Amino acid sequence: MRAASLEACGCFPTGRHYPGIAHLLRAVTRGLVEELAADAAWVELPIALIDVETTGTDAAVDRVVEIGIAIARGGEIVERRNWLVNPGRPIPKEASDVHKITDDDVKDAPPFDAVAEEIAGLLSGCVPAAYNAAFDRAFLGAEIARTSAASSAPAPAFRRSVDWVDPLVWARELQQGERSRALGEVAARLGISLENAHRASDDADAALRVMLALGRDVRVPRTYAALVQEQRRLAMAQADERRLNKWR
């Protein structure tokens, strides 16, 4: 079993790939940002951790009211940005109760279309990431599809072919003995503070720090290709387990 596992992965248990196969990695690993080296240490790559706050939970009908992005390069957070966004509709009380953003807060804010190009520029060339990535990816994709930015050269975060790194998947794997996977509690267990939970830039910063901290665990692959491949496997296994538990 060990030999079969190594052969499928193309790497040693440390995540370092066999010599001479770097040119083959992209052919067998889906989900990579094509501009970035598959055999690079993922922690050294530019990573954009994205967090959105919204009017609800359905990306098809609800809208973004705040977006925060934290950028890491070489394993260090080098930039944080935040935008309040006017959703063009009232923010329901149940949504405001979570993120504390009200209609008054966004009445003079620009619509998403007005900041889309700026956001796309910041995300250019970066590995996209988010905590519970399916949520943020769905909302960001829905918003960008409504704008003229959708027709320009897409940043990796806007490409359907690119996998987002998801610290939640890794928290579920590496903190299996813990009941809560809420960002604040996962962060606290790693000694990372989150003072303003559910505000986009604070959540983005904390989630990126969580991913970098989890990445120091020896069970996390070192290279970008191996990380994406293993995250896919873990996400599928975790989804299967949740479905099984639902029917027990």
Segment roles from a protein language model:
Residues 166:
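Amphipathic alpha-helical interface segments
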Residues 2-161, 176-181, 185-198:
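Conserved non-catalytic scaffold segment of RNase H-like nuclease domains
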Residues 2-40, 209-248:
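Acidic two-metal-ion nuclease catalytic site recognized across multiple nuclease folds
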Residues 127-144, 173-247:
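Acidic, Mg2+-coordinating catalytic module of metal-dependent nucleases/exonucleases
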